[in-house]
Amino acid sequence: MIGIDIVQIERIEQLIEKYGQKGLERFLLPQEMEVAKKPQTVAGFWAAKEAVAKALKTGIGKELGFHDIFIYKTEKGAPEFKLLNGKEQMFRIQQTALSISHDAGVAVAVAVIIRC
């Protein structure tokens, strides 16, 4: 299954300006906030979480929340994700792939998920 999302970086900048750290805590885990220092990185993480939720055909809501999706970077800087809080078993995840990019004022993410 494939999910994709795109977000304007300016939208994330406005969220940060208006709500600050509390705004970020609504959708980022503490470990993610350590990595996502720039608005374009935050926007990429937002898009990635939305893309994962779309790939699972659930969206963000009761079944899957922002804090159930952990976005991280490998040693080489490639983005990856894990589902937390038992969601990996619930959705029967076998294999995943994630790509995040940002350019021209937008961040885009594509998530690929293979289920058992």
Curated annotation (Swiss-Prot):
It comes from the Bacteria. It is found in: Cytoplasm. It comes from Nitratiruptor sp. (strain SB155-2). Its cofactor is Mg(2+). It is an enzyme of class 2 (transferase). The keyword Magnesium applies. Its EC number is 2.7.8.7. GO terms for cellular component: cytoplasm. It catalyses: apo-[ACP] + CoA = holo-[ACP] + adenosine 3',5'-bisphosphate + H(+). InterPro entries: 4-PPantetheinyl_Trfase_dom, 4-PPantetheinyl_Trfase_dom_sf, ACPS, Ppantetheine-prot_Trfase_dom. Its main location: cytoplasm. Transfers the 4'-phosphopantetheine moiety from coenzyme A to a Ser of acyl-carrier-protein. Transmembrane segments: none annotated. Belongs to the P-Pant transferase superfamily. AcpS family. Gene3D superfamilies: 4'-phosphopantetheinyl transferase domain. This is Holo-[acyl-carrier-protein] synthase. GO terms for molecular function: holo-[acyl-carrier-protein] synthase activity; magnesium ion binding. Keywords: Cytoplasm, Fatty acid biosynthesis, Fatty acid metabolism, Lipid biosynthesis, Lipid metabolism, Magnesium, Metal-binding, Transferase. Mg(2+) binds at residues 5, 50. Pfam families: ACPS. GO terms for biological process: fatty acid biosynthetic process.
